[in-house]
Every structure is written in C-alpha cells, then in structure tokens.
Amino acid sequence: MKVNDLVTVKTDGKTRREGTILAVETFQEGIMYLVALKDYPAGIWFFNEADSKDGTFVEPKTLPDEE
C-alpha cells in the first residue's frame, strides 16, 4: 500500500473505519501507516506486524467491482 491509497483500519470498535494513507514507514518488524480518518484528519499511526495476521490493522479498501 502507498500514500493516497484508500484503506480500512481495525480499531477498538466492531466495524472497520475507512481512511486514506498519508505516510508509510517501513521497519524490520512491519510497516507503520499514517492514516487520515474522518475524526482525525491529521492522521493516526497504525502498525502492521510483518509475521502476524492478528497484527494487521490496515488493509486496502475493496471496491464493489473488485470483490
């Protein structure tokens, strides 16, 4: 995923929230994404762990014609 991609993020709520990637930082353990959300337009950092599906918080938004 890259800057300006539409994504969904897993938060403490039950539904995923939609946002846009503002920045990407790669680390040995995974990738951090700065994601702008409706309530947080300046962005919040989310970390996707490299080796754990449970540690994946940011995923590409799937458009209806891509399903």
UniProtKB/Swiss-Prot annotation:
InterPro entries, A to Z: Dextransucrase_DSRB (IPR019717)
Pfam families referenced in this protein's UniProt entry, alphabetically: DSRB
Superkingdom, natural source: Bacteria
Signal sequence coordinates: none
Family of this protein: Belongs to the DsrB family.
Cross-referenced HAMAP family: DsrB (MF_01549)
Designated name of the protein: Protein DsrB
Species annotation: Pectobacterium carotovorum subsp. carotovorum (strain PC1)
Gene this protein is translated from: dsrB
